[in-house]
Amino acid sequence: MSALSLPAHVDVPFGAGNKGSVVEAEFSVAKRKTYTFYLNLYFMEGDAQNKERVRKLAGTGAYPDGRQIDTGLAIPVRLRVERIGNNGASSILDRIFTDHDREGMAADHFSKLITRIWLEPGPYRAKVEALENIPELEDISVHFNLLVAHDRGGP
């Protein structure tokens, strides 16, 4: 099985609360699809107090009238996505994101959406940079995550 036949997936620790912290990851896209970029905020399993604190930072995830009630803690990041080619890299996305809707929850983390973008097959590099010092994230494990978007009928 070649690297291009594997689904794109990135999951790396990221110092989202430390200004200037940067993580970079290379990945391959096999099929033209929408890919989702997240910040995952982890909580300690079995610690209800810690889970509730992280939930407040992640926001409510509720959508009255199609809008989020509370996006939680603003986590300003700059996301750059480049397609890697024989003649170097070409920019696909270079944008600052501040407020992230809480989009989901797993057994050990809450997911805050950065963005979704269509990617064509090929090799890519994603780089995310923290733009502010955020004391509330000091003892929270945050991961930068990328995966194929669930089909929601939109872009």
Regions found by a protein language model. Give the residues of each.
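Acidic, Ser/Thr/Pro
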Residues: M1-P155
